[in-house]
Regions:
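Charged, amphipathic alpha-helical coiled-coil/dimerization segments
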Residues: 41, 69, 91-149
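N-terminal helix-turn-helix DNA-binding core of bacterial DNA-binding proteins
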Residues: 31-34, 38-85, 163
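C-terminal regulatory/oligomerization modules of transcriptional regulators
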Residues: 1-21, 139-178
Length: 178
């Protein structure tokens, strides 16, 4: 040892060390979206518990009330879920008597999903859930509508980016330029 003290790079501010400045966690769009999503799910839980629904089941029922019967693939696409996530969800809903699943007579490879009478009966009670949630969200109706439009635009752009990335990855694999 020479007796000299040296500063480690961890003692030097990032800007002085020439490091790239990374935005703080609370400045990250992804974290704001992640936090908002988690909190919305928590707000829904006490509203959906009396109906015997989880938040993902609620979303599945909303999609099925709009388009039933639906193929498992179309439902997964509407919800943004892959079959490994969707199939167990549908099995629980079927066991609870909310939906039926059956093979498509026109194409045995396809499974059709639709609400049962019990599942349809929940529809009238969902309006109360929507109203209660609207009262819990700290946004004026016009703000909520604007946020919804912005998020819908964001989701469409992200889906496009994910699709383009997947296509580029597939092209690279086929051409051998990975």
């Amino acid at each position: 040892m020479t007796g000299k003290t040296t500063k480690s790079t961890s003692d030097v501010p990032a800007e002085a060390a020439g490091a790239i400045r990374v935005p703080r966690l609370d400045q990250q769009l992804c974290f704001a979206l992640y936090s908002a999503s988690g909190l919305m799910t928590k707000l829904y839980r006490p509203l959906l518990d009396p109906l015997g629904l989880t938040y993902p089941q609620y979303l599945a029922m909303l999609a099925l009330w709009e388009h039933a019967p639906s193929t498992v693939g179309a439902l997964g696409e509407a919800l943004g879920l892959d079959s490994a996530t969707l199939t167990p969800l549908l099995k629980r809903m079927e066991a609870g008597g909310l939906i039926t699943r059956r093979r498509d007579a026109a194409d045995e490879r396809r499974v059709l999903v639709e609400p049962t009478a019990k599942g349809q009966a929940l529809r009238s009670r969902i309006k109360d859930v929507s109203l209660a949630l609207a009262c819990s969200v700290p946004l004026e109706p016009v703000e909520a509508k604007a946020l919804h439009a912005t998020l819908t635009h964001l989701v469409a752009g992200l889906r496009n980016a994910v699709t383009e990335d997947a296509s580029a990855d597939a092209e690279a694999l086929v051409s051998g330029s990975t």
